[in-house]
Amino acid sequence: MVKQQSKEEIALQLKSAVYLSVAKIVEAKLEDLNNDNAATTTTESNNKNNNNNMLIATPTFIAQLVELVYNQLINLGEDLELFCQHANRDIVEPSDLFMVTRKNPTLQQHLKDLLRQ
């Protein structure tokens, strides 16, 4: 028997997935930034000071970033749903996403290029 998930359970699963993705992205970006910082340091005395200049992301920062990303995803989903309903459709189409991104022509063009591929 298939168990129906409640909206709260689905939201919790989505938030968990967002947390994992955001945490991995932050970790990778910090590693890149710290490696770039270490590569620009040339003397040993600077290397000692460089360890003090390592960038870190606190759990609070990551949690707040997750909240921001999650809320943006919820807003995006609501906007897509509204554009779809306005066009009397039940299925979201690329044109709905282009309507959401209409104020960011660079992003819109990038999405159109991805669609053509």
Swiss-Prot record:
GO biological process: DNA repair; replication fork processing; resolution of meiotic recombination intermediates
UniProt KW Nuclease keyword: no
GO function term, MF aspect, one: chromatin binding
Gene3D superfamilies hit by this protein: Histone, subunit A
GO cellular component: FANCM-MHF complex
Domain of life: Eukaryota
Keywords: DNA damage, DNA repair, DNA-binding
Complexes and interactors: The MHF histone-fold complex is a heterotetramer of 2 MHF1-MHF2 heterodimers. Together with MPH1/FANCM, forms the FANCM-MHF complex. Component of the inner kinetochore constitutive centromere-associated network (CCAN).
The family this protein is said to belong to: Belongs to the TAF9 family. CENP-S/MHF1 subfamily.
Job description of the protein: dsDNA-binding component of a FANCM-MHF complex involved in DNA damage repair and genome maintenance. FANCM-MHF promotes gene conversion at blocked replication forks, probably by reversal of the stalled fork. Component of the kinetochore, a multiprotein complex that assembles on centromeric DNA and attaches chromosomes to spindle microtubules, mediating chromosome segregation and sister chromatid segregation during meiosis and mitosis. Component of the inner kinetochore constitutive centromere-associated network (CCAN), which serves as a structural platform for outer kinetochore assembly.
Name listed for the protein in its UniProt record: Inner kinetochore subunit MHF1
Lineage: Eukaryota, Fungi, Dikarya, Ascomycota, Saccharomycotina
